[in-house]
Amino acid sequence: MDTKQGVLDILNDLTGEDLSDQMDENIFDNGLMDSMASVQMLLSLQEKFDIDVPVSEFNRAEWDTPNKIVAKVESLENE
């Protein structure tokens, strides 16, 4: 499974929405995600992709669209 599909699967589980056609939509501004969902998302991403994203270092502006989430996960996978 590629990173994009894995991220979309997690977001679908958390939001109940297929976001594949909304890759640049802000998932916080449109009400699909809140702070509790952010924590769940980070935990799911860490488990699925074996990456480390401390909640204390989470900057919502860097993770607010599906495309940004995919890019962050890919950069953390390459560390």
Swiss-Prot record:
Pathway: Cell wall biogenesis; lipoteichoic acid biosynthesis. One of its GO terms (molecular function) is D-alanyl carrier activity. Keywords: Cell wall biogenesis/degradation, Cytoplasm, Phosphopantetheine, Phosphoprotein. It is found in: Cytoplasm. Residues 1-77 form the Carrier domain. The modification O-(pantetheine 4'-phosphoryl)serine is found at S35. It holds the Pfam family PP-binding. 4'-phosphopantetheine is transferred from CoA to a specific serine of apo-DCP. Belongs to the DltC family. This is D-alanyl carrier protein. It comes from Lactobacillus helveticus (strain DPC 4571).
